[in-house]
Amino acid sequence: MIERGKFRSLTLINWNGFFARTFDLDELVTTLSGGNGAGKSTTMAAFVTALIPDLTLLHFRNTTEAGATSGSRDKGLHGKLKAGVCYSMLDTINSRHQRVVVGVRLQQVAGRDRKVDIKPFAIQGLPMSVQPTQLVTETLNERQARVLSLAELKDKLDEMEGVQFKQFNSITDYHSLMFDLGIIARRLRSASDRSKFYRLIEASLYGGISSAITRSLRDYLLPENSGVRKAFQDMEAALRENRLTLEAIRVTQSDRDLFKHLISEATDYVAADYMRHANERRVHLDQALAFRRDLYTSRKQLAAEQYKHVDMARELGEHNGAEGSLEADYQAASDHLNLVQTALRQQEKIERYEADLEELQIRLEEQNEVVAEAAEMQDENEARAEAAELEVDELKSQLADYQQALDVQQTRAIQYNQAISALARAKELCHLPDLTPESAAEWLDTFQAKEQEATEKLLSLEQKMSVAQTAHSQFEQAYQLVAAINGPLARSEAWDVARELLRDGVNQRHLAEQVQPLRMRLSELEQRLREQQEAERLLAEFCKRQGKNFDIDELEALHQELEARIASLSESVSSASEQRMALRQEQEQLQSRIQHLMQRAPVWLAAQNSLNQLSEQCGEEFTSSQEVTEYLQQLLEREREAIVERDEVGARKNAVDEEIERLSQPGGAEDQRLNALAERFGGVLLSEIYDDVSLEDAPYFSALYGPSRHAIVVPDLSQIAEQLEGLTDCPEDLYLIEGDPQSFDDSVFSVDELEKAVVVKIADRQWRYSRFPSLPIFGRAARENRIESLHAEREVLSERFATLSFDVQKTQRLHQAFSRFIGSHLSVAFEDDPEAEIRRLNGRRVELERALATHESDNQQQRLQFEQAKEGVSALNRLLPRLNLLADETLADRVDEIQERLDEAQEAARFVQQYGNQLAKLEPVVSVLQSDPEQFEQLKEDYAWSQQMQRDARQQAFALAEVVERRAHFSYSDSAEMLSGNSDLNEKLRQRLEQAEAERTRAREALRSHAAQLSQYSQVLASLKSSYDTKKELLNDLQRELQDIGVRADSGAEERARQRRDELHAQLSNNRSRRNQLEKALTFCEAEMENLTRKLRKLERDYHEMREQVVTAKAGWCAVMRMVKDNGVERRLHRRELAYLSADELRSMSDKALGALRLAVADNEHLRDVLRLSEDPKRPERKIQFFVAVYQHLRERIRQDIIRTDDPVEAIEQMEIELSRLTEELTSREQKLAISSRSVANIIRKTIQREQNRIRMLNQGLQSVSFGQVNSVRLNVNVRETHATLLDVLSEQQEQHQDLFNSNRLTFSEALAKLYQRLNPQIDMGQRTPQTIGEELLDYRNYLEMEVEVNRGSDGWLRAESGALSTGEAIGTGMSILVMVVQSWEDEARRLRGKDISPCRLLFLDEAARLDARSIATLFELCERLQMQLIIAAPENISPEKGTTYKLVRKVFQNTEHVHVVGLRGFAPQLPETLPGTQTEDTPSEAS
């Protein structure tokens, strides 16, 4: 069994008192309990808003303004919302176990109108674990949350896999989705459907018996049978159209003769005048064309002379302009020659200064070396003098010490002290604290050896210093050379840069050696380039004169072609006279041939008109008389085949009509006798029981019942056994099935379903195998589907039958036309077209005249061509020897390439000239740059340190030697030896002092002399540097001046400049000569143009006079042609055979037709006036207006629904074919379309019976409903007495009123209305038309009266009215009615929705406290039995044993209003479980 869909929960977001509240809805009854203002109505309003989000309907009564005249604009919704985004969402589970969340986003709109913006949406595929409040809120912290906007909600759901979010722009789409998913019971297609649904919800919400629903129960419970109404409307429309068409045919038949007469006479009248004007116009135009031809010839000659004048003037202007430019170029070439000469003189000065600078550079380098050597020697002298000074000072100090000792008493104590002092000094200097006089000698040897070692190391360092000083000087010299060439650079890069410079120097010298050969090569190429440019100029001038561009390869062939042209032009002059004579002879022959053809043309044109009519009618092209006769035989065969096919299609169409009539029977009975038998037996046709089966199930049930699908279901077979005896008026096989027609099912047979087939076990030994029919007709849907396909087939067959009938008659008329053509025109129709031959001959004649007229001009042109050819040959003779230069496309590139190479070579020469000496000096010393002698300073430091070490070692050795020498001072016995030792030492010191002073004197003298020499060398170096800098600056100035001149001063520059000047002088002379020639030719051309202008003026005067005469005579011709083409009558008026008649013959023809037309249009005022106006010979366009008026008059009288053209001539042809066929066909169609009144009555009666049975089934569900004193509720459906009488008359007494239904002036609806008025004269119909009343009578719902009755106490069955019932009884009765409506909607919508869906059922009840406990229990029982959900509200808790109860209390905390909610489950023992997040009634907890 299919589970019914349920509403799971209701969620309110940001409503007044509810920020984020979800109410879990019970499967049966959910109760909202609370005092006034607790939020019960707000909760229900949120549910209703989500269910029906239509602001035009929503109106919550408890906010209606008392005493207001127009009601509240708010309608109760604006005040229930908080500012910002609000939501109301319904969480549902449908029969397919799909979770669907539907809801609306609400937002207050700022303004006085207190409007609310509503956006419906739906969410599918949401997991069960996700709560609705989680979707639309975002938690900010433990106590704060934020409501998401609709866009944020969509983005959030898009991130969830499998979840679909849909936003709806219309309420219809929103409700359509809810219907398809089983949330609502009825498809709400329109605002009217939504209004019905809202009224039902509103009636449920506020309780009681709703008068709005009870008054219109027919609309709520009875479905509209739109198919029947549409069928009647289509039938009446078809009948009306047929009658109108038949009437039009009759009118058209009377107009046929008038059409023929008017068309024939009007055509002769207008066409004769039209062709006469056309002939006259052609004659006048030929004369005007002759004048215009001469005029154009003269203009062409004048234009040629003007073109020639313009060309010569342009060429003269070019030469004038070229002369100015050539003069400027010549002056520029002269100036350039002067600049080259100046540059050459400047170059000579530069070369002299460069030689002087090179000599100064050598002397400067030599002087630098001398100064450097003198500076080194000066440093050595200074060092030597400083050393001598130090030695003298030391010796003087020592000598002073000994002298002081000698001045004191030579006592032992002094000596002893001196010895002790010497020993202490030795210990200090030698760092020997343990030194004793006894060990001093040993230590003296050691320190003397150390002194010797230090002296040797010092000598070695002196040698290294000398070598390093030399290397340092060489490195600095090489580094300075590299820096001078390359510029500033790091010392570490000197080696790599030096090698690169040396390699580059080799390349630069190599390039510098190529300067002179390159200059010679460049001079040669520049000469060839100038020759090439001259050749290009000659070629451009030649192409300009020839008016065409030529390739170089084409010049030789062109030369030969021009020579051949010269030869041919000379030959063509001799043949000119013979050609002229031949052309004149041919012209005379053409004239005689044209006259003969013009006599034969009218006969041939008449035959062609007839042949073209035949071709248009049959769609074939005929090229011979044999084809015409063969096609006539084919027509006879085609006519026989068409007649046979027409009869076959007609038979098939009749069969389809019969099948449609059989399937259209009410109840699905294919045999009318079955309906009568069903009424006789008190049964129902099986097809009527299954009338509502869907199209998908129709094949199954058709195969299930097989041949018994047309059986009659009767309550008891035993009761009809006697009636079967003697039964003859019945089908051959009559099937009877016992069963209750009101609750019949398919359990009659044991059946096994196979693939597209069933096996029915009729008995133990009898099975029936039936396949599903491909075209089932079981059930109304299947029959309607089959009828629809049959109607489509019938339309095709009808169209085919009409086409074949038309073809048959058309073929017969075509056969007659062919017979007439063969008898009259077959002999001449297939001859050659004489007009085409005339046109061809006229064209040839015009060509001959043109050839004769242009013969003389051809000779002149040939002479001009001869001169041009000779001039071209002369130019080519100058060009051909230079073709090789023109073909050399790389010459300019090679000049540029050589120029670039020469620039590079000159740059290399300048580099070698500037840095050659430095590179030569750098090459032998470049190897010293490999290692940077920057260690020279370190070596100097090492030398100073070694010198200090040697000095220290010497002092230590001297101190030890003094101790050793003073060993005697330590002994008192050695004083004499000590004095003698002191005397010797003093003498040695004096000798050394004298030597040192002498050495110092010599060093000082050498230092002074060498300093003077160094100063002299430095002065010479400064003088050389000053001279070098001065000459270098002068050289730079000269080079800048040379660069400013901007001329390359080489050996051939002067010669090239002079040659260029001479060439320009020659061009200037040639240009002046050509200019003089053009001025003379231009004067001659102007004189010729003046003569032609005078001639042209005379021709223009003659031509304009003739043209003015043509225009004056034919002023209206353009209007005539425009009118003819705009109205499309040119084909009718331009009759070519009339072109060969004379003007008098055409006038006579037109006058005869005019007389006939006056009689024909005497009764038509409009045509008579137009004809009178057309008789004016000066206004030919009025005749066209008359012809158009005749055609328009006839066209307006053509019925477009009958005749398939707007051309009256073609209409006459179609009339002959269509009239009889359409008359017969439409008459038969009207008879078939007409429906009998008995059938109408049967259809309406069967429909009423079916709906009564359905209401009876609905009443069964309400038998046990009781509220208070009300024991039961039922719905009565009765047929109105007046309408029942109408049905009886239609089915039994229709013969008495055939005057209504057989009238051609009344439609069936109007006849039905007239019958109703005839039967009920006492009823006032008001202002309604019979058509409107008849359409209402075709709706079965207008035949029924419906009312609700209750069985109350001792009163029995009473009509349910609010005044007769208590409040609780009215609420219960109203709820019962609403349940019946909902169930009816579900039954009605079952065919529109999937069979696997059972929709949700939910109703509301506000103020439910007015019901007693028994009524509440009845409601619970009703909800459980009908699987319906109910939401009720009461000020007090009614404490039901079943369902869910929410206790609502509105509180205010810190100026914030919220509703406190406690949820309770029913306390019945069978439902012990609690709500999620709540507790049992004994321990209630607050619902979050």
From Swiss-Prot:
The protein's name in its UniProt record: Chromosome partition protein MukB
The organism of origin for this protein: Salmonella typhimurium (strain LT2 / SGSC1412 / ATCC 700720)
Free-text domain note: The hinge domain, which separates the large intramolecular coiled coil regions, allows the homodimerization, forming a V-shaped homodimer.
Cytoplasm recorded as keyword: yes
Highest taxon, organism lineage: Bacteria
Region (Flexible hinge): 666-783
Record Pfam families: MukB, MukB_hinge, SbcC_Walker_B
GO molecular function: ATP binding; DNA binding
Assembly behavior: Homodimerization via its hinge domain. Binds to DNA via its C-terminal region. Interacts, and probably forms a ternary complex, with MukE and MukF via its C-terminal region. The complex formation is stimulated by calcium or magnesium. Interacts with tubulin-related protein FtsZ.
GO biological process: cell division; chromosome condensation; chromosome segregation; DNA replication
